[in-house]
Amino acid sequence: MEHVTNIAYPHFAINGNLSYEYLFTHELSHMWFGNMVTCADAGDMWLNEGWATFCQYFYKHDLYSSETYRQEMNENHYDILKNAHITDGSYLSLDEVPTEYTYGTTVYDKGATVVHSLMNYLGAEVFFDAIKAYLQAFAYAPASSEDMRDFLTNYTGRDMTGFFGTWVFTPGTPHYSIDSAQVTTVGDEFEVQLFLRKKHKGVDYIGGSHQFEIGFMNANWDIITDTVQFDGLHGHSTKMLPFEPILVLADPFDRTADATTDESFTLDQTGEYSFPKAGFRLYADQLTDSAWFRLTHHWVKPDSLKIPVNGLRLSPYRHWEVSGINLAEQDLRGRFFYSDGASLDGSLFESTNDSVVILYRQNPADEWQAIPQYREGLWNIGYVYVEELLPGQYTLAVWDTQIVGLSENPVSKPQPEIKAFPNPTQGKITFRWEQKFSGSLIFTDQNGKISLVIPLENTNQIEVDSSRWEKGLYLIEQKNPKGQAVAWTKIVVL
């Protein structure tokens, strides 16, 4: 806890190792953010706590590595996108946080990601120089978000109205994407016409002075970056490159904490690859060559159907995008997790009449369409398997059996029943099925995380103690030795 010239540090954190190194950094940072300059009122507490939280991440950039900082900031950002509006009651702006959430997730953790985005918006050199000057200008005095905005505008020569309007004064999180890219050969160079999009997670907001980094990758997987700026919901930018880009990426190095989470890697071995933050699993069944794979989880609703279909609802909350190099030549499948939990798909599902499917389009110019798939699980929690995973965008949707034209979508077939009792439960729960079985019982929580795996050996009953589990909905799958789900049920832990 910060007190001027006397920062309190808990005894338990002095334990002879580095496990509380982050806390030491956080509290020490209050010598500047909180003591030297303090927030003008409690609603602006992010100027104290958000900046100290940023410091507790950023010190690892220099002490350990830039990749360590990037990974830990990304973990923090993922938690904000998924949970902050739940733990803090709603989407909150940073400058007017209610007193009951003064020390909540938005102030601390989202505050840190906004500082991260501000650093990359200005550039690190300008950012650190400007913040040192800000601390001197307001030394031993209070400052508000408006004060910081105006000071940075005057000091850097850049109008910070747009940035603060989008990131500080508006609830939710901006979302930036590339709608399309057109490449033309011009002599020995390549001209790239970029068409850009802006959305917003949580609230409807347009804003201006948007900026994010673009990555251009060639056939050898070399990448160069440049920055784009635009106002409003749509933008355009022209870039000249020394090589022909095979792939154009939004924010490839996570320098802007917008409403996306991304994971990328080199795909050079067959097998399963898990993307827990995105609720996705990749199955590489056969590879003809190495490939570069990227999955983006967009935490905003997908574009609407160009021609509405009565009774078909697309997710109002999220969608996925698969991109990469050499992907079309590979034999790939994908598994998408769905759950009506509040942090994922609660706004999509309405009743047991809903039947979940995955829709696909190659790019934003195309219409969403049905693709071969099958489902494992229940109407409100489970997985959808896509039999042929191609580059493009994927979204959850729900439909009923009366909709014409979607009956070809395969859904889960009736499976042997797993009985669970008592259900709901607060402690021990028994699972029973008709015939003895060998394989495993997989427990997945409502966020898509596997919480328990129990081996089964020639048995038709098992008892589990759930007394220490987190409350919520769980999907239970019975899988044979080949990893195929043969039965499932759900339980509620109170």
Where are these regions (language model features)?
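C-terminal beta-strand-rich structural cap/linker in extracellular carbohydrate-active enzymes
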Residues: P242-D258, Y383-I403
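Residue-level detector of functionally pivotal "anchor" positions at catalytic/ligand-binding pockets or at interdomain
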Residues: T266-L267, V398-F421
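C-terminal outer-membrane/trafficking sorting elements
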Residues: P410-F421, T425-L494
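Hydrophobic alpha-helical and helix-loop surface patches within well-folded domains
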Residues: M1-F195, G202-V203, V248
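Proteolytic processing hotspots in large secreted/extracellular or virion-associated proteins
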Residues: D303-V357, Q362-N363
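Surface beta-strand/loop "capping" patches
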Residues: T166-Y205, D268-W292, L314-P316, G324
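Short acidic/polar inter-strand loop motif in beta-rich domains
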Residues: P252-E263, P481-A487
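Beta-strand-rich binding/interaction modules
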Residues: P174-S177, V183-D231, S237-L247, V356, ...
